């Protein structure tokens, strides 16, 4: 988990630019897995539309990991255009060629939906790290 104050594209870039070459390659890691979350509290419309978009992802963007506490967000009574956009962190992970689970795990403690994320180190290196290093 990353503290909300540091959840930005710049912070994520710094994490991956340092984590991949310095830690993961030295460990000879092949894969990284974790989760990406969307808060439900005062955010039901965004959670609903994000969940819908994840259901529409291509097969190469999906990993079949099922949750025993799956959660299906209900369609909101109203929403704003910004609610219909997938959160940037989800887009970033998809841009890194990661795979997401279609099912969301409902985390009662944090009041959020967690989607499983699976990344191949070689894909991170080619699609994200090298691209960011060239941009420096």
Regions found by a protein language model. Give the residues of each.
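Acyl-donor binding region in acyl/amide transferases
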Residues: 1-98, 108-112
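C-terminal/domain-terminus segments
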Residues: 88-90, 100-135
């Amino acid at each position: 988990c990353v503290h909300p104050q540091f959840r930005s594209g710049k912070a994520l870039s710094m994490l991956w630019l340092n984590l991949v070459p310095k830690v993961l390659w030295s460990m000879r890691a092949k894969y990284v897995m974790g989760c990406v979350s969307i808060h439900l509290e005062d955010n039901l419309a965004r959670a609903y539309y994000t969940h819908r978009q994840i259901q529409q992802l291509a097969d190469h963007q999906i990993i079949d990991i099922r949750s025993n506490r799956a959660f299906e967000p209900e369609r909101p009574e109203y929403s704003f255009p910004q609610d219909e956009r997938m959160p940037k962190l989800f887009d970033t992970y998809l841009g890194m060629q990661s795979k997401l689970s279609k099912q969301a795990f409902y985390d009662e403690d944090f009041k959020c939906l967690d989607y499983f994320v699976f990344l191949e180190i070689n894909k991170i290196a080619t699609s994200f790290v090298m691209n960011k290093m060239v941009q420096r």
